[in-house]
C-alpha cells in the first residue's frame, strides 16, 4: 500500500534502483522517498542502511543506548494494517508494531519505536475470514477500493 501511496503522491517520476540499499529511491525537495525491494519482513534492514548513509542514527548505534533515538522528524513509515477498517487510517509514533512484521523489523533494526507511522486500514471482514492474513495482504484492490484509497491518500498528504 505504501508503494501505491508514493505513486499517488509523486505521480509519474523516475525511480532509481539502489542495489546497495535494496530499494527504489526518488529524491526531491529535500525528501528521500523509498520503495524497499526486500521482503516486507526485512524492511528494517533497508531503513537502517539509508539512515546510516545519511548519518541520522546516533554515533553509538549498535551499542545499548540509554535513551532510544527519536526519529519522528526524520522517518515516516506508511504501511497497511489489518486491524483498521478499509478506508480508514491512524497515525502512530513511539508505539509497538501491533504484530506488523515489517514495522517490527524496522523497530528491531533501529532499536527504537520513535518514528512516525501512517497505518492504512485494509481490513475487509468478508474476505479476511476466508483468506489467511499473509495472502489477504497480497490481494489486488478493485476499482472502488482504489478510489477510496485515493481519498485516504489525499487526507494523508495534507497531514504529511
Model-derived regions, located:
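Nucleotide and nucleotide-moiety/phosphate-recognizing core
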Residues: 1-93, 104-118, 125-132, 146-158
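Short glycine-enriched, charge-decorated loop/helix-capping segments at active-site entrances
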Residues: 90-96, 136-141
